[in-house]
Structure formats: structure tokens, C-alpha cells
Amino acid sequence: MVLQQATKVRLWGNATPNSSLKVRSSWDNTEYTAQVNDQGRWEIWVQTPSASFEKQQLTLKNGQDKIVLHDLLIGEVWFGSGQSNMEMPLRGFWHCPIEGGNHAIATSGKYKNSIRYATIQRVGALEPKDYPVGGEWKVCDPRNAPEFGATAYF
């Protein structure tokens, strides 16, 4: 995961209704507290430091439940959005290779500690959603890079 540097970032989720949730950041060891509403929803704003390739973590506690988000980077978050031009992966499509794609994939490991990539699931809805749809952050390496969007990568 990557959090935008030098700003307040919004974290949110679900927890035990009418309880409190604590979030602790590894970069400054600050503990933040959020009140969980009667529907089990919470949100909190956390101050982030300047960009760094040093891996960070966030610890979330709600009663006996504890979640630790590891391998977190603080830096610039870029969004690549569009249609097929943004969807084409570094590996290319069948009979549609990406110029320089194979070399980029083979050498992508050099960015393992500095680039993270997430593809957000495509989901349609007729009404606005309360929460964004899922996705998973991937480390930049030859195993994951073939699926990275080529336009966003280059």
C-alpha cells in the first residue's frame, strides 16, 4: 500500500458498533482514536510524513481484534484511469506486444522497494456506494509486473 506523503490521509472501515478503534502509525508512533458508530463504521485522518522508501506499518485495534498493515510506503500516489489504453498490461495482449514491455518486466525487480501497484476491481452500480470496491497492492517485481498497466508504468 502507498499513502500520500506530507498530508492527512483518510482511513475508514467497519468494526464493532459503538466501540472505539485505535490506529498507531510506525513513522511517528502517534495513536489516533476513532469512535465506531452504531452501524459499525468509523473513519479517521492520519498525518503522513515526507516520502521515504522505508517500509512503515499501521496497527489497528478494536477490543481484542488487531490488524497490522505491513510493507506500507509513504510517497506519491498516482492514479491511471481510462479505457483500453490504460488497461493494456505490460505483457501486452495477444498479438499486440508492448514495445519495451519484456525488458521492463525483466528489470522491474529494481523497483521492488519503491513502486506499488493496485488494480481496482471493475464493478457497476446504479446507486452510489458507501465504500470503494476492492483491489490489492502488488510489489513491483517480474512476477507481478506483467499485469501492471503499461501506460501507467512507463
Where would I find each of the regions flagged by the language model?
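Cell-envelope and extracellular/periplasmic
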Residues: 1-154
